Amino acid sequence: MTKSSDERLVKNAELAEKLSALHEQKTVMIASLNADTSPLISYAPFVEKEGAFYIFISYLAEHTPNLIERPQASVMLTADESTTANLFVRGRVRYEVECTVIERDNTLFDEVLVDLEQRQGKMVSLLRTLGDFYLIRLQPTMGSLVVGAGAAYRF
């Protein structure tokens, strides 16, 4: 391997580590569009499975009908403010996502909710009994990672 190949491998490993750290966050910020196309920002606890984010949210929450009726959104994970030296270049990853409802009779529904409860706690069991909650898959189609000043990457 050449020196530049080694440097690229090290850089890729560093980026993968930073991306992995962002994915350890327990909530994801969600940008969706209201019926009048005005933007709405919100958040939800999530779990990842097979390259997608899954959120379990009430239809009464303003963002839920947005994600169901206009199934394109952006989501973002950010580094913790308390561990960020310079908030102007706070580490973050943003994804454009396609949104799909996972029906309760789909075997994936039970699998994901088990994973979600392991990650987010017992509240998931209670929410599962409420009929107005929807499991929504947020499937990334493209992403953008910012790790510092002048250090942004699209993938």
Predicted ranges, named:
Residues M1-F155:
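Binding-site signature for planar aromatic cofactors or substrates
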